[in-house]
Amino acid sequence: EATSALDVSVQESVIELLVRLQKEKNICMIFICHDLALIRSFAHQIAVMYLGHIVETIPGEDVSDHAVHPYTKALVGAQFSVHMDPTKKIESIESEAPSPLDVPVGCPFQNRCEHCMEQCKKEMPELKEIAPGHEVACFYVDGMKKQTKGGR
């Protein structure tokens, strides 16, 4: 997490440097960070991980409006902004995360997911494309997509 302990102005300088190097050298970068708002500001593609598993990949510009995995949606809902509606509830995930040394069988997010089904406790969902550049690993989302016969 290259920017986690930095002052916001220094953080901005580091991001600007990385973006400039990326363009000048025509390189791809993997940037690991817990600050979704920061990542969204410059990332072309975002991969959201939970307990070491990628649960959603999504274009950076789409993460706030089109995230569908329950964990990604919780991350988006937990973001605070001074510009946000003061009546809007900041989301939180109620239960504790399991130990990364003892990840449950099936979906790693199952014990914290309000949409957990029996299938989630038995099988690991695979990433499936739901829109161009957007993949999600979630049986609940699979079921919703089948019900609505399409993505967004």
Which role fits each region the language model picked out?
Residues 58-152:
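Charged, flexible cofactor/metal-binding loops and thiol motifs
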